[in-house]
């Protein structure tokens, strides 16, 4: 039996928003398994889906760049927001995004590519910037999307300047249609992705493990009702259909016009575009996603200083 520590209870409480005693019981019931404990709380109706687990803490900026039928998004982290507002830092991430356009978009490829302003690799150029600015920096994530015909639309939220901000989105639309129409609907869909963070483009593309986890939670919730298994199965199937509608891009209610789905909104502009439109890819990077920032205990710091 795993020992349930105060730190574990605190972590579960922060992730689930549930009470301390509920968290302690959940951990005891699941032998200290954090993810299973979250599911246990959800099944009991004590906690909602774990939306706090990907806590955003790191500073820095997200940068996007476009060239022809290709676009990239990169994340450059810094220790403080003050440095992220520095012109040199902003120029650096814009430059890195431009370099990323010449690669396959992976962090390794971008890091190894030559940064024109210095003639060195991007990785070494970041090291030089660290020495100059005096703060650690990390090229944490990078991604690229490309279509042979169509557009890759971009959107930056909380923009700190041209092409840089706290959240960046790419969405690839494959089409032979009018570019102006494609860019317009593409930007709207990118804004939608920024707002809703869909798990996949289509329901059938949702990760099987994620879907299975949801189904198991729904089964436990339904069993709490005490209804027969046949009824429970129908209840779960209904909840799963709703789950897929809510997490798959094309079946989500369009934030710009909630009366229709994203898929329907795209279909509506096909006539104006003069060709069919297919969403072939999407990327959404939120600054610091999944990175825990060290939080100092002010009271403990004062106590430590007082003790000399």
Swiss-Prot record:
The keyword Protein biosynthesis applies. It holds the Pfam family EF_TS. The keyword Ligase does not apply. It is found in: Cytoplasm. Keywords: Cytoplasm, Elongation factor, Protein biosynthesis. SUPFAM superfamilies: Elongation factor Ts (EF-Ts), dimerisation domain, UBA-like. GO terms for cellular component: cytoplasm. InterPro entries: EF-Ts_dimer_sf (IPR036402), Transl_elong_EFTs/EF1B (IPR001816), Transl_elong_EFTs/EF1B_dimer (IPR014039), Transl_elong_Ts_CS (IPR018101), UBA-like_sf (IPR009060). One of its GO terms (molecular function) is translation elongation factor activity. Residues 80-83 are annotated as: Involved in Mg(2+) ion dislocation from EF-Tu. It comes from the Bacteria. Belongs to the EF-Ts family. Associates with the EF-Tu.GDP complex and induces the exchange of GDP to GTP. It remains bound to the aminoacyl-tRNA.EF-Tu.GTP complex up to the GTP hydrolysis stage on the ribosome. This is Elongation factor Ts.
């Amino acid at each position: 039996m795993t020992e349930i520590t105060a730190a574990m209870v605190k972590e579960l409480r922060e992730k689930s928003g549930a009470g301390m005693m509920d968290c302690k019981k959940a951990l005891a019931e699941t032998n200290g398994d954090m993810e299973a404990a979250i599911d246990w709380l959800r099944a009991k109706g004590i906690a909602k889906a774990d939306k706090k687990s990907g806590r955003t803490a790191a500073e820095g900026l997200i940068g996007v760049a476009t060239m022809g039928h290709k676009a990239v998004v990169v994340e450059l982290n810094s220790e403080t927001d003050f440095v992220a507002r520095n012109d040199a830092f902003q120029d650096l991430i814009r430059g890195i995004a431009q370099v990323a356009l010449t690669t396959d978009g992976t962090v390794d490829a971008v890091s190894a590519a030559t940064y024109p302003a210095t003639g060195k690799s991007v990785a070494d150029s970041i090291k030089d910037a660290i020495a100059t600015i005096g703060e650690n920096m990390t090229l944490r994530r990078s991604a690229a999307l490309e279509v042979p015909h169509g557009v890759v639309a971009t959107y930056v939220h909380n923009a700190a300047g041209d092409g840089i901000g706290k959240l960046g989105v790419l969405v690839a639309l494959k089409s032979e249609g009018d570019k102006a129409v494609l860019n317009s609907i593409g930007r709207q869909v990118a804004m939608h992705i920024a707002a809703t963070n869909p798990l996949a483009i289509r329901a059938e593309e949702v990760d099987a493990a994620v879907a299975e986890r949801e189904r198991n939670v729904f089964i436990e919730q339904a069993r709490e009702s005490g209804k027969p298994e046949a009824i429970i199965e129908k209840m779960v199937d209904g909840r799963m259909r709703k789950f897929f509608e809510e997490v798959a891009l094309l079946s989500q209610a369009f934030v710009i016009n909630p009366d229709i789905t994203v898929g329907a909104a795209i279909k509506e502009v096909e006539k104006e575009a003069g060709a069919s439109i297919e969403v072939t890819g999407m990327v959404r990077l939120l600054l610091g996603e999944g990175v825990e920032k060290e939080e100092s205990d002010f009271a403990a710091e004062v106590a430590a200083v007082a003790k000399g």
